[in-house]
């Protein structure tokens, strides 16, 4: 898997040398093709395994009493999630541009996320402050929504279930030609050691995490010409800041 620092070096080399640009472009194309092929080849038998488990449950309900049955389901679900995120990561810098109301998108995300909290985590209060004068945005609407929902979901998971007053806040404003989105939570926080590598692929500090969510988010934001950063005080709060050129 190519890391962000590798991509930065390659982009610089491609600008300086036309021959290198052609060679690197071909290597990147082969890299994307290889990852897609591997994911596809693994997904097919994994789908068969998942289907077989479902059939076994229907025909032999007693298998649910097997001590490791639920773990088998969790392992298959984890592999499916990993393949989905791997495919998304592989295509994260391929954007489908359109012009849309970023303000309306943020409002829709806020409503959807608030509803999901009401259903599952009523100990968490969610609030949003979206500036009413945001300009239209040109970018990949679906992938930006994916980034924001991923960060909001991480914030949700960072707040322990025994917290009496969990809080998540999303703020969006436009300063000159820059869109700034901040997402804050009062969850467990992230240690300084973990902050250094949190955007690296396959880096995760939570159970059943794939380690691709934040790395994928970073690649999508950077593909839009923006930046994403994080600040955290362990045991107090975490702040993710997204900056996107309008």
Residue positions per predicted region:
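Short alpha-helical Gxxx[C/S/T] motif in the catalytic ATP-binding
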Residues: 213, 217
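Conserved HAMP-HisKA connector
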Residues: 15-39, 50
